[in-house]
């Protein structure tokens, strides 16, 4: 059985990746309607799409001009498949350009648009059913369509864009110059839902139960009767992977819990108790803290930290695997967001991810990444569907490199202890305030900055701890959480009084973007 045959019974909409910073959100929004969706390379052929058998195709936006020497193209036979196609921004320009219309640099036409604009609908359309004649949308385009291809007609325009929405209903081709996938397009979700349900004919019946069945079948086909190693960190992602793999292959799974000395307070014992005890996973606990901390001594660059941890993690696995027989696979809790942040063919690398860019080329295992098409909120939903308790599913996200990337600069035991203890206080107080479900992620960071303070009658010169708390839906964008002042005050007071070598607390009020969630 191939992956394609496993997916044949699942309706799906494929998003072709042309490099937009928002393209992963298109798939995310479509999934909200109960329709499976994923990104594929713009280089995909019509024949490959026939084999995947999607009910719809979306051409994403992108930063390039259709006239650029390195412009991303499309197999022209895709337009002849008879499958509904929606072109967004660059996608609309590409449809126009390839089918005989005219696209010009927007500056030449005097109609460059960035930011919110008002869309004026001139005709009724299935794509805009149930939305008002005038609506706010997010425009972000350098080129613009000035002549549409034969068979197309105008659906909507804006003050600076003569063709903001076009369609050819006979061929099921649709184009919009704006981005419906972002919240700034007020009726964007309605538009995408109209495309998925009304135009593509989606049933809207895809769920985590479907995903579980699909992944279990894929895992069994991939693994066969061979054995899998999973690195457990104690975080949500690896825990969910562990339970999913256990359900798929049972005792063919061996979990290795590497205690690299960079864990949160009491985390090692909690991992063994929850997953080893309650779920019966076969877990080997390895104390490798000295190996990791020795390698990380005096290392300040965050990318070097990630690479060292990623490499050493695999070497520890090699050591343990050599004691076992017939282990061929390494499972990881890589998410969709991890892959995107590590860069794709069309997108710039933001930072290498510990589950993506830190692995050596001569790694001795094949990789299995069952969650690499899911966003964080979907992983939590998967955990619930697998019968996992909420205390595991809603556990705070924790990066593979652990506290190494929450200690700025060189790592010392003293700095690690300040983060462990301050983070435990933060989590305790957030829970006491009943905010643990409202705040998507929260943790502390040792900034590496020392400052002068006064404690008792004496002068201090100690570390500054930063609190990072964010709200988010899928981890792709985030806002800083507006925690109540009384809660922040209590957290600050407890940390400076209970944690040695800390005399100052600051609160990170930066959204993502421009910042990432983690400081390193």
From Swiss-Prot:
Gene3D superfamilies registered for this protein in UniProt: 3.30.300.10, 3.40.50.880, HUPs
Entry GO MF terms: ATP binding; GMP synthase activity
Catalytic-site annotation from UniProt: 89 (nucleophile), 179, 181
Keyword Transferase: no
Segments forming domain Glutamine amidotransferase type-1: 12-205
Pathway membership: Purine metabolism; GMP biosynthesis; GMP from XMP (L-Gln route): step 1/1
Source domain of life: Bacteria
The keyword Transferase is assigned to this record: no
SUPFAM superfamilies: Adenine nucleotide alpha hydrolases-like, Class I glutamine amidotransferase-like, GMP synthetase C-terminal dimerisation domain
Organism expressing this protein natively: Streptococcus pyogenes serotype M12 (strain MGAS2096)
Protein name as it appears in the record: GMP synthase [glutamine-hydrolyzing]
Assigned keywords, A-Z: ATP-binding, Glutamine amidotransferase, GMP biosynthesis, Ligase, Nucleotide-binding, Purine biosynthesis
Positions annotated to bind ATP: 233-239
HAMAP family: GMP_synthase (MF_00344)
EC number, as in UniProt: 6.3.5.2
CC terms in the record's Gene Ontology section: cytosol
Encoding gene, per UniProt annotation: guaA
Catalytically driven reaction(s): XMP + L-glutamine + ATP + H2O = GMP + L-glutamate + AMP + diphosphate + 2 H(+)
GMPS ATP-PPase domain segment(s): 206-395
């Amino acid at each position: 059985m191939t992956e394609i045959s496993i997916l044949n019974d699942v309706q799906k909409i494929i998003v072709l990746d042309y490099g937009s910073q928002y393209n992963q959100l298109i798939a995310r929004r479509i999934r909200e309607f109960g329709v499976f969706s994923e990104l594929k390379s713009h280089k995909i052929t019509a024949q490959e799409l026939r084999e995947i058998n999607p009910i719809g195709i979306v051409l994403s936006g992108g930063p390039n001009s259709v006239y650029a020497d390195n412009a991303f193209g499309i197999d022209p036979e895709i337009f002849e498949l008879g499958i509904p196609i929606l072109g967004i921004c660059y996608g609309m320009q590409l449809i126009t350009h390839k089918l005989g219309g005219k696209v010009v640099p927007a500056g030449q036409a005097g109609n460059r648009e960035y930011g919110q604009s008002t869309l004026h609908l001139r005709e009724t359309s299935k794509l805009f059913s149930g939305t008002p004649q005038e609506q706010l949308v997010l425009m972000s385009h350098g080129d613009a369509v000035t002549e549409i291809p034969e068979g197309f007609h105008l659906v909507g325009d804006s003050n600076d864009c003569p063709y903001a929405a076009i369609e050819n209903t006979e061929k099921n081709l649709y184009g919009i110059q704006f981005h419906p996938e972002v919240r700034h397009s007020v009726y964007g979700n309605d538009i995408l839902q109209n495309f998925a349900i009304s135009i593509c004919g989606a049933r809207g019946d895809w769920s985590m139960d479907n995903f579980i069945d699909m992944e279990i079948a894929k895992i069994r086909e991939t693994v066969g009767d061979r054995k899998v190693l999973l690195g457990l960190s104690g975080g949500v992602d690896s825990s969910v992977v562990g339970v999913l793999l256990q359900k798929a292959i049972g005792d063919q799974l061996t979990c290795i819990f590497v205690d690299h000395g960079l864990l949160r307070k009491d985390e090692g014992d909690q991992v063994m108790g929850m997953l080893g005890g309650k779920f019966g996973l076969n877990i080997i606990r390895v104390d490798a803290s000295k190996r990791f901390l020795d390698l990380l001594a005096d290392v300040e660059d965050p990318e070097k930290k990630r690479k060292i941890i990623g490499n050493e993690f695999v070497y520890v696995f090699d050591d343990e695997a050599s004691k076992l027989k017939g282990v061929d696979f390494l499972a990881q809790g890589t998410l969709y967001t991890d892959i995107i942040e590590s860069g794709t063919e069309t997108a710039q690398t933001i930072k290498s991810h510990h589950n993506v860019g830190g692995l050596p080329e001569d790694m001795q295992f094949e990789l299995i990444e069952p969650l690499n098409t899911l966003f964080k909120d979907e992983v939590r939903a998967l955990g619930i569907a697998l019968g996992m308790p909420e205390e595991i599913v809603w556990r705070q996200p924790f990066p593979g490199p652990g506290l190494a990337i929450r200690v700025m600069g060189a790592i010392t035991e003293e700095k690690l202890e300040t983060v462990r203890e301050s983070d435990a206080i933060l989590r305790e107080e957030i829970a006491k305030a009943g905010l643990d479900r409202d705040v998507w992620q929260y943790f502390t960071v040792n900034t590496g900055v020392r400052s002068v303070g006064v404690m008792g009658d004496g002068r201090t010169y100690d570390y500054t701890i930063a609190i990072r708390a964010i709200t988010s839906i899928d981890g792709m964008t985030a806002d800083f959480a507006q925690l109540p002042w009384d809660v922040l005050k209590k957290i600050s007071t407890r940390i400076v009084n209970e944690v040695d070598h800390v005399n100052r607390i600051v609160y990170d009020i930066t959204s993502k973007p421009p910042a990432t969630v983690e400081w390193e």
